[in-house]
Every structure is written in C-alpha cells, then in structure tokens.
C-alpha cells in the first residue's frame, strides 16, 4: 500500500510531548483474534496468517508442561557426587527452583589464620512470575572454620513486588565472619595463597551477629531510592592457627592491624551498633 497527501502540523504546543517515549496498555498482548480483525487497518496476507499460526503453535508447545518438564528433567538429574559438587532442581512450569551450592565449588573453600581452613555452602529457593514481575528468594549460607571449630549460619528473604517500579524488600540475619573493611577488598583466594605460601595473612576478621531489613523502589522514572536498617553485635577474633605450607621462622601477624606483633591483642571491645 502507498499512502499520499500527508497532513503535517507545522508547530506543536509546548506540552504536547512528555517524557514518555512508548507505553503499552495492560494485557495488550492478550487480545483475541476478533479484536485485531476489527482494529487492524490492513488485513493480513495469507503468508502472514500462516506465519502467525505456525509461531503460535510453536509457542504453545514450548509453554506446555510436557515440553517444559522434559527440558527440566535433563538438568534435574541427581547423583551422589552432587552432594559434594552441588545440585539444582528447576520446575519451569510452576516457576520455582532450588539450589544447593555444594562444598567443592571455586571459592567455597579458603584459609585464614582466624578460622584455618574453612568451607562455605548454602541453599536457596526461588519463585517467580513472568507476567507480574514478582520474584521471591529464600537463601541460607553456612560457613565452618576447622581450626576455630565454629559453624556460622545466616539467611535472607528477598521479594520483588513488580517490574513496574521494581519495589523490593529484603530481610536477613544470623552470624557471619567479616573483614574490617565492609567492602571486603581482599579475596579469600588471594588471602589463602598469600597466607599459606608466603605467611602474609592480610585479611583481618571479626565476628558479627546481625539483623537487617532493606526496602527500595523507583520513585520516579530513572530515580531509585532505598533505605536500610541494620543491627550488629560485633566481637573481635584472635588467630587460632599458625599452620603454613612454607617452613621458615617468620611469624604470622596478629588479627589486630593496630598491634600486628601482639598475638593476644584485640582491636576493639565487644559492642552493638544500629544504623
């Protein structure tokens, strides 16, 4: 079709155009065929009709429970080795998944002079809704230090309400071991190598029992606001091991960065913080 005799407007009022570039009406992609036949300005060609029918059939199959279950079954296979390496189970049709981290993933094991060798693992459960954008996750993390002989456990709940303003709430708590610098600039792997092979125990750690709640959302287009309430009970820790793979007369520094040569020194007293 060729269109001619366009009518162009030479000028528009100042408020004719807003910041909105494009918008979609709710359920715009859920209309029946009769709706499109009534409002479509140009009828579909036979080729277009055939193409849409083919794509609709493929989409129907790929969204069917039989098809989705068959795809999930390949990734959901379990064997006893996965108890060590980790395991994931997914139900795409019902939109949920479960994950176990295992204990042999990269980063799950490390070494520091406070805990000695330590392992991380955990579980997580996710539930989502593609139509509304809702998303919920529940996760837990376990950390055990062999020289320290202590297990630390913490958990977190996260819920996103929609994908319009991406409003979310997050609640967490438990016990954890943390670096003095909250940004945790020293990676566990780097510290493990530096400690075991060069006796440079850079990472300084403390224990925290904590509870926190976070909320955030997009308040206006492009501007996101969030808030956080946090409680922590902080306690200083001491080195519990002098183990190393390098045999020499060098000694480890203490876990107090202010008095590195005093192994019994603690950098701060036990205290609580709210922020």
What are these regions (language model features)?
Residues 104, 129-131, 146-150, 175-183, ...:
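Gram-negative outer-membrane beta-barrel proteins
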Residues 126, 141-145, 172-176, 212, ...:
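Outer-membrane beta-barrel pore domains and translocons
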């Amino acid at each position: 079709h060729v269109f001619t005799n366009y009518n162009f407007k030479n000028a528009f009022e100042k408020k004719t155009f807003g910041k909105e570039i494009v918008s979609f009406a709710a359920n715009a992609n859920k209309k029946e065929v009769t709706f499109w036949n009534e409002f479509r300005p140009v009828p579909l060609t036979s080729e277009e009709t055939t193409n849409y029918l083919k794509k609709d059939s493929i989409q129907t199959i790929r969204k069917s429970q039989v098809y989705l279950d068959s795809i999930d079954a390949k990734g959901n296979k379990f064997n006893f080795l996965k108890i060590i390496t980790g395991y994931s189970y997914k139900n795409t049709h019902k939109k949920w998944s479960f994950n176990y981290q295992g204990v042999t993933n990269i980063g799950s094991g490390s070494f520091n002079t406070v805990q000695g060798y330590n392992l991380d693992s955990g579980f997580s459960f996710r539930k989502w809704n593609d139509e509304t954008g809702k998303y919920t996750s529940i996760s837990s993390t376990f950390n055990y230090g062999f020289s320290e002989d202590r297990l630390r456990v913490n958990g977190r709940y996260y819920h996103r309400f929609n994908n319009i303003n991406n409003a979310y709430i997050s609640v967490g708590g438990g016990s954890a071991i943390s670096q003095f610098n909250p940004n945790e600039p020293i990676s566990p792997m780097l510290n493990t190598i530096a400690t075991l092979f060069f006796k440079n125990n850079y990472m300084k750690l403390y224990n925290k029992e904590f509870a926190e709640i976070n909320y955030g959302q997009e308040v206006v287009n492009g501007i996101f606001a969030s808030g956080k309430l946090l409680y922590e009970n902080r306690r200083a820790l001491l080195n519990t091991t002098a183990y190393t793979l390098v045999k020499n007369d060098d000694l480890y520094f203490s876990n107090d960065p202010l008095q590195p040569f005093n192994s019994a020194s603690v950098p701060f007293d036990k205290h609580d913080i709210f922020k």
